[in-house]
């Protein structure tokens, strides 16, 4: 359930920051989509990049919704499990903790990038997978940080339902066979 209330004038500096965040998120999505094309569909790295794109798209939608609310001078009130969402009392501490975790995740990814550059070809796939995994973690932390700093509940909801199993179910009492 979403309630709309009329509010006063929007802060121009907040609007500029929000526009910069939206532009940055669009760039991240574009970069990730280009990166996605370099890996075959169904590979672990391809799927990790696709997950990162989905997280970025949700973050972008959240930021665009906040920007539209500012432009129309509307206050959005969110409910979680039937209860109006309110920012936690320790919001500043949570934001600081998220910023620390984000810095650590970025440092870890950078470390893996450096190690990969000096590694033998035989171990590069391991570093690529590790880097892709850490980049998903970074996207998740960025989403949480954007949610906290823009007044959204920091929950991630998948964009689409999970794919159904490609393996057919065997009738009761019969073994499953591959076709």
Range-by-range predicted roles:
Residues 19-20, 45-58, 122-142:
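Short, charged, amphipathic alpha-helical segments
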Residues 36-49, 75, 111-128, 149-151, ...:
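Charged, low-complexity interaction regions
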Residues 14-42, 47:
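Post-signal peptide N-terminal segment of mature Sec-exported envelope proteins
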Residues 10-12:
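Bacterial signal peptide processing site
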Residues 96, 149-179:
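Compositionally biased, proline/threonine/alanine/serine-rich low-complexity intrinsically disordered stretches
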Residues 5-8:
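C-terminal motif of bacterial Sec signal peptides marking the signal peptidase cleavage site
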Residues 40-94:
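Extended alpha-helical coiled-coil "stalk/arm" regions
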Residues 32-36, 54-77, 103-110, 134-152:
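Amphipathic alpha-helical coiled-coil segments
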